[in-house]
């Protein structure tokens, strides 16, 4: 018996995908379902030899980066994407958010697959303990959670777009860096699958934010624009400290900060706003951009189901005589 109060929707209409109010809902749904993947199909165990070439400090860095990403995916899967559902303008938009929430949980599980393959239980426990104690990681989680739990739908979409299109990228840098040096290439292939999903998520939520702006007056639009840049500055300052804490020891901090600024501009574009950082502050290491590209060594195809590491069994019809040896 339920003892607490639970607010339930008292009436739901059957969703009709043959009648669309916004064609973008079906377009993004088809993209996301066509891109569906699971971490168990990526042979991360093939990375054990190159994992063994990393120093203890490099291994610790990699695990902490992935644990930080796990936290963001957990937030987005269980709170962020779900918080957008009540304010959806169409039932199809609601359905897309449920897909996004599910895939964020798949992403979170992906990092556990990497950990269980490459790391010991003690190392895994240490990494998760670190994630609970790192002030900058917990601070960015707190910032976005405040807006997810607030009562302003458009501000929720801004926070969600910044998480999807900006906050993940201090973590995404490292596997692309290793991949550009022919290390952890199967792990990088999995991360590319995640990045491909996040790119669609950020684009879609930003698009829905722009649709929402049309429904408010000029004063409200100006207020939301100011809010967006203020929130980005707050998150960026915290992200710089987080990046320094992680990457100073390996001398990659300045490169990662360029990658952050590059993706901050992309997040603003998703929201319909102009870039904040000038081009000379966003000149990302070409090796990183190459590792991100669909033509990277792993031959990842961003527009089909998976990268070359992704393994799906093929069904073949057999007859009795095929089993006569």
From Swiss-Prot:
Subunit: Tetramer of two alpha and two beta subunits.
Cofactor: Fe cation
UniProt: Fe cation 1 binding residues: 73, 104, 107
Top-level division of the source organism's lineage: Bacteria
Job description of the protein: Provides the precursors necessary for DNA synthesis. Catalyzes the biosynthesis of deoxyribonucleotides from the corresponding ribonucleotides.
Keyword Signal (UniProt): no
Amino acids binding Fe cation 2: 104, 164, 198, 201
UniProt GO MF annotations: metal ion binding; ribonucleoside-diphosphate reductase activity, thioredoxin disulfide as acceptor
The family this protein is said to belong to: Belongs to the ribonucleoside diphosphate reductase small chain family.
EC number: 1.17.4.1
Organism: Mycobacterium leprae (strain TN)
CC annotations in GO: ribonucleoside-diphosphate reductase complex
GO biological process, one term: deoxyribonucleotide biosynthetic process
Primary enzyme class: oxidoreductase
UniProt remark on cofactor binding: Binds 2 iron ions per subunit.
Cited Gene3D superfamilies: Ribonucleotide Reductase, subunit A
Reactions accelerated catalytically: a 2'-deoxyribonucleoside 5'-diphosphate + [thioredoxin]-disulfide + H2O = a ribonucleoside 5'-diphosphate + [thioredoxin]-dithiol
Lineage, broadest ranks: Bacteria, Bacillati, Actinomycetota, Actinomycetes, Mycobacteriales
Name of the protein described by the UniProt record: Ribonucleoside-diphosphate reductase subunit beta
Keyword list, A-Z: Deoxyribonucleotide synthesis, Iron, Metal-binding, Oxidoreductase
CDD domains to which the protein is assigned, alphabetical: RNRR2
Annotated active site: 111
Keyword Cell division: no
């Amino acid at each position: 018996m339920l003892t607490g109060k639970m607010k339930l929707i008292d009436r739901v209409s059957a969703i009709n995908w043959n009648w669309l109010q916004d064609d973008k809902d079906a377009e993004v749904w088809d993209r996301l379902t066509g891109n569906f993947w699971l971490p168990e199909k990526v042979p991360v165990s093939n990375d054990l030899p190159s994992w063994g070439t990393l120093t203890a400090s490099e291994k610790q860095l990699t695990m902490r980066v992935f644990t930080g990403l796990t936290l963001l995916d957990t937030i987005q899967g269980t709170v962020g994407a779900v918080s957008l559902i009540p304010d959806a303008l169409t039932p199809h938009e609601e359905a897309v958010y449920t897909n996004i929430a599910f895939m964020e949980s798949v992403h979170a599980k992906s990092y556990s697959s990497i950990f269980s393959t490459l790391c010991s239980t003690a190392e895994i426990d240490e990494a998760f303990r670190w994630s609970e104690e790192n002030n900058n990681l917990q601070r960015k989680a707190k910032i976005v959670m405040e807006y997810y739990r607030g009562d302003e739908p458009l501000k929720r979409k801004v926070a969600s777009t910044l998480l999807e299109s900006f906050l993940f990228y201090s973590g995404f840098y490292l596997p692309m860096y290793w991949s550009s040096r022919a290390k952890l290439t199967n792990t990088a292939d999995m991360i590319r699958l995640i990045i491909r999903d996040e790119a669609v998520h950020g684009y879609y939520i930003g698009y829905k934010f722009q649709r929402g702006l049309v429904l408010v007056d000029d004063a409200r639009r100006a207020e939301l624009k100011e809010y967006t840049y203020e929130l980005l500055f707050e998150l960026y300052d915290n992200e710089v400290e987080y990046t320094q804490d992680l990457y100073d020891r390996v001398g990659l901090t300045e490169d990662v900060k360029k990658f952050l600024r590059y993706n901050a501009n992309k997040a603003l574009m998703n929201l319909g706003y102009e870039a904040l950082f000038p081009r000379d502050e966003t000149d990302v290491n070409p090796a990183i951009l190459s590792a991100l590209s669909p033509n990277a060594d792993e031959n990842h195809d961003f527009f089909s189901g998976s990268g070359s590491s992704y393994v799906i069994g093929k069904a073949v019809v057999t007859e009795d005589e095929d089993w006569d040896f």
